[in-house]
């Protein structure tokens, strides 16, 4: 819940000097990206901008305090301020912020700018007291904000110092409007106008000018002088001489003498007590100070000129001028030290009564009241956790004694989930083990079950499947039906365990159950995770179309619940890329992988490993080895600078081994084979993939016998576990083994099996990646004309893809190739004496690549009759009588030129 006063522009007070010269300068603010108002405290920054903002509608105001250094809270108020300025225009961004469904502040701002692109009128966002921000992440995010904000948006920042916002760059590009303390200082005319408004007896212009010069136009000093003059303690000039040369950090003695010592004791105590509140209203004042009519007292303090300012148009919320408020809080610690804990307790109770637990926690911490803090957390901690108030919760839990946590195991569980959310897995188990050791009877019942559900999640994250399964089952046995969150967690973990163990049918049922439970209770991140798991399982089972449809449901969920910036979104677009790659939709697969990298742009580069491997896979399928090599350099750098899950490493190794196969790099393959992990089992698609990498490297090195043993065992496991996609991949690799070993009939047998299975999986690129060896076999099968219709159609499609992406390496008779061929000493004399035309060479290449006459005509964009003429001519020149002889002739020429066909 947001405090309204922090989103309200200060009310323009009576008796303030209208700064016409500065307002004129600000009138052109819409021409700049940033308007920066900087000066020490008390120079009238906020008053000036509130005057400028008067009458403007499209303006949001965000008043910072010390609590806004947390990223999540900063985002909450900033987005609320934008919504205030745009009358709720950025609904998607607001929902993402409220549900904490964004990866970082920069990604949240990126979504904000997408929505603001449809807002065409000038827009202003004011951030007051920016000097209170010390969080470097917020600074970096605001630099991003300024770089990318729409042209019609102007950011107005008020700060006591120069903020870390890339000011120099903006200044050079003339995108910065600056007003500093020299410009903010009152002129002689403004000082005279100020005193005329404040004093019952006006002072002479010359006297006013001398006073103004004595304090260098410092507005707060002028206000203190006027206050002293009204109280008749000193002459205005005497006060000015005393204030001359001092600054905001040396005001304490003066404020004691000239303000606190000149009010009655009741007012003094009111000022000191109320100052502990960062913002205040009638109810808070009544509870904290004991005054019966808080609103009336606030208005009276305001009339006395005691640095109290209204924070909203309704006059409900007030705050002290920051300079005076800090002074009062310091004095309160000295003068009311014994009462201070009780004052903070009263403030906490009042904030709680108004529904602001975060502010209540602030005061409970200040009071050092562990019991009050405990009670607030017991009632509101999980809500704060779900709203990502992690820093506040961590500070609060650290403030509680261990005995208090033991007496309230729910708080131990909360602390453990906090650690889990921060990936501190080792600390989770240590904390829970210590709690179980010290809490009597905790080893049974609901709380123990909740502990086990969390432990199960930690175990599966750590790759410990057996322990995760044991703990998840225990949790589900002990959890009551109403404990939905822990039941969702345990069910999800159990489904993931079965997935890892290859029990796909049972796993699918559990993750579908998880989805239903998560949707029912609005636990959207688990609903999304379950859909991703379902898609992976269906893919492994060979039901790729159903996997696609499940992914569509996941994308719909992301759009409906604004989950675009969760890291899981990257997982979804990555498995979509894998599916698209499988179906040879390479451009779409590449775009999807790149969007995954974009989702992870705010995370460490190591997180992008999987998407980078997918991009390399696309390059390899296209035969673009130069691009693949460039991307592989980056991938290998990431591998050497991070710690990854085994299936991440397996996917990365897959593209490396395929690249070595395509380039014939046996040394790299042999070195990798010596050091790579050899899993104990192959009962899921992760482990199958790593063993396939090993077999591919062995085939490249000519180690056919051990590779065959590996692949036969993989196939046995894949068939028993119904890992149909893995079976399809294994058959293709076994085909390559047989082909290279010269076992042509075995190669044809498993290729026919692979083509038949591909009717179910839809595989295309897995065939294409095998290159010319696959192309030769498919040409032979097509020419035999014995394939069933579906297999025939798929074989032709695969051959077209190979020709499209790989022809330049083995079947494209371009001009340079032909020139080298004709100059080769072993070229047949018939070709030398009766050379083919360039078009006839092209036709020969397409015949060799398996194209029919109609396909050749389409490729070269000529009539079919013209192609027949070209074929007749080239047959005559080559001395061949039919198509198969022409293919064999082309193959001899390619071998002569050094192509391994």
Curated annotation (Swiss-Prot):
Keyword Nucleotide-binding in annotation: yes
Keyword Lipid biosynthesis: no
GO biological process, any: positive regulation of DNA-templated transcription
An example Gene Ontology molecular-function term: ATP binding
Superkingdom of the source species: Bacteria
PROSITE patterns per the UniProt record, alphabetical: HTH_LUXR_1 (PS00622), HTH_LUXR_2 (PS50043)
DNA-binding region residue numbers: 853-872
Domain HTH luxR-type: 829-894
Documented activity regulation: Activated by ATP and maltotriose, which are both required for DNA binding.
Binding site for ATP: 39-46
InterPro entries for the chain: P-loop_NTPase, Sig_transdc_resp-reg_C-effctor, TPR-like_helical_dom_sf, TPR_MalT, Tscrpt_reg_HTH_MalT, Tscrpt_reg_LuxR_C, WH-like_DNA-bd_sf
Family from the record: Belongs to the MalT family.
Subunit record text: Monomer in solution. Oligomerizes to an active state in the presence of the positive effectors ATP and maltotriose.
Its job: Positively regulates the transcription of the maltose regulon whose gene products are responsible for uptake and catabolism of malto-oligosaccharides. Specifically binds to the promoter region of its target genes, recognizing a short DNA motif called the MalT box.
Protein name: HTH-type transcriptional regulator MalT
């Amino acid at each position: 819940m947001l405090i309204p006063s922090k989103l309200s522009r200060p009310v323009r007070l009576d008796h303030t000097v209208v700064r016409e010269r500065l307002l004129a300068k600000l009138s052109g603010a819409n021409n700049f990206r940033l308007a920066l108002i900087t000066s020490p405290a008390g120079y009238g920054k906020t008053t000036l901008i509130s005057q400028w903002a008067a009458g403007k509608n499209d303006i949001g105001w965000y008043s910072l305090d010390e609590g806004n250094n947390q990223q999540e809270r900063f985002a909450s108020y900033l987005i609320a301020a934008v919504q205030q300025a745009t009358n709720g225009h950025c609904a998607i961004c607001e929902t993402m912020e409220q549900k904490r469904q964004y990866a970082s502040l920069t990604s949240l701002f990126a979504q904000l700018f997408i929505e603001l692109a449809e807002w065409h009128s000038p827009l202003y966002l004011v951030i007051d007291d920016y000097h209170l921000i010390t969080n470097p992440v917020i600074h970096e995010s605001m630099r991003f904000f300024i770089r990318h904000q729409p042209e019609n948006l102007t950011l107005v920042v008020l700060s006591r110092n120069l903020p870390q916002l890339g000011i120099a760059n903006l200044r050079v590009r003339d995108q910065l409007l600056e007003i500093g303390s020299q410009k903010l200082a009152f002129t002689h005319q403004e000082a005279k106008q100020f005193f005329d408004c404040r004093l019952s007896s006006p002072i002479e212009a010359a006297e006013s000018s001398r006073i103004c010069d004595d304090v260098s136009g410092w507005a707060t000093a002028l206000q203190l002088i006027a206050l002293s003059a009204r109280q008749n303690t000193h002459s205005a000039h005497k006060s000015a001489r005393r204030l001359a040369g001092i600054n905001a950090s040396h005001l304490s003695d003066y404020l004691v003498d000239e303000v606190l010592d000149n009010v009655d004791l009741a007012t003094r105590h009111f000022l000191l007590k109320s100052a502990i509140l960062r913002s205040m209203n009638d109810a808070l004042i009544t509870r904290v100070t004991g005054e019966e009519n808080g609103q009336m007292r606030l208005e009276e303090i305001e009339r006395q000129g005691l640095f109290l300012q209204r924070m909203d148009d309704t006059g409900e919320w007030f705050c002290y001028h920051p300079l005076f408020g800090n002074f009062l809080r310091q004095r309160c610690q000295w003068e009311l030290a014994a009462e201070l804990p009780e004052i903070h307790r009263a403030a906490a109770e009042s904030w709680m009564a108004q529904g602001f637990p975060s502010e209540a926690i602030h005061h409970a911490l200040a009071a050092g009241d562990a019991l009050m803090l405990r009670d607030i957390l017991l009632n509101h901690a999980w809500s704060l956790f779900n709203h990502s108030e992690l820093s506040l919760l961590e500070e609060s839990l650290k403030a509680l004694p261990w005995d208090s946590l033991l007496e309230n195991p729910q708080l131990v569980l909360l602390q453990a989930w906090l650690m889990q959310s921060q990936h501190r897995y080792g600390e989770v188990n240590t904390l829970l083990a210590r709690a179980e050791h010290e809490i009597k009877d905790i080893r049974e019942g609901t709380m123990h079950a909740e502990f086990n559900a969390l432990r199960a999640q930690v175990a599966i994250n750590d790759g410990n499947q057996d322990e995760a399964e044991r703990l998840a089952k225990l949790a589900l046995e002990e959890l009551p039906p109403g404990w939905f969150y822990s039941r969702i967690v345990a069910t999800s973990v159990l489904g993931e365990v079965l997935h890892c163990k290859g029990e796909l049918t049972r796993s699918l049922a559990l993750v579908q159950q998880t989805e239903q439970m998560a949707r029912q209770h609005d636990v959207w991140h688990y609903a999304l995770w379950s859909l991703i798991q379902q898609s992976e399982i269906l893919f492994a089972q060979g039901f790729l179309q159903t996997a696609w449809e499940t992914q569509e449901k996941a994308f719909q969920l992301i759009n409906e619940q604004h989950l675009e910036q969760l890291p899981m979104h990257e997982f979804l677009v990555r498995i979509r890329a894998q599916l698209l790659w499988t179906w040879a939709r390479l451009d779409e697969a590449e775009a999807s992988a790149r969007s995954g990298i974009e989702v992870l742009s705010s995370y460490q580069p190591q997180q992008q490993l999987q998407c980078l491997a997918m991009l390399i896979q696309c390059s390899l399928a296209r035969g673009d080895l130069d691009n693949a090599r460039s991307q592989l350099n980056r991938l290998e750098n990431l591998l050497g600078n991070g710690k990854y899950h085994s299936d991440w490493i397996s996917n990365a190794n897959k593209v490396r081994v395929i690249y070595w196969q395509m380039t014939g790099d046996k040394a790299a393959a042999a070195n990798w084979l010596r050091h790579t992990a050899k899993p104990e089992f192959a009962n899921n698609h992760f482990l199958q993939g790593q063993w396939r990498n090993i077999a591919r490297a062995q085939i490249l090195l000519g180690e056919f016998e051990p590779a065959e043993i590996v692949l036969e065992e993989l196939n046995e496991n894949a068939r028993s576990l119904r890992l149909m996609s893995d079976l399809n991949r294994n058959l293709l690799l076994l085909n390559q083994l047989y082909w290279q070993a010269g076992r042509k009939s075995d190669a044809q047998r498993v290729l026919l099996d692979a083509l038949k299975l591909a009717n179910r999986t839809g595989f295309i690129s897995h065939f294409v990646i095998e290159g010319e060896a696959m192309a030769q076999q498919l040409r032979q099968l097509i020419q035999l004309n014995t394939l069933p219709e579906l297999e025939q159609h798929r074989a032709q499609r695969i051959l077209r893809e190979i020709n499209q992406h790989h022809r330049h390496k083995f079947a494209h008779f371009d001009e340079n190739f032909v020139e080298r061929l004709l100059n080769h000493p072993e070229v047949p004399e018939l070709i030398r004496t009766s050379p083919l035309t360039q078009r006839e060479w092209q036709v020969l290449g397409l015949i060799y690549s398996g194209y029919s006459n109609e396909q050749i005509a389409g490729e070269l964009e000529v009539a079919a009759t013209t192609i027949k003429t070209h074929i007749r001519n080239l047959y005559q020149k080559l001395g061949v009588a039919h198509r198969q002889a022409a293919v064999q002739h082309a193959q001899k020429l390619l071998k002569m030129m050094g192509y391994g066909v």
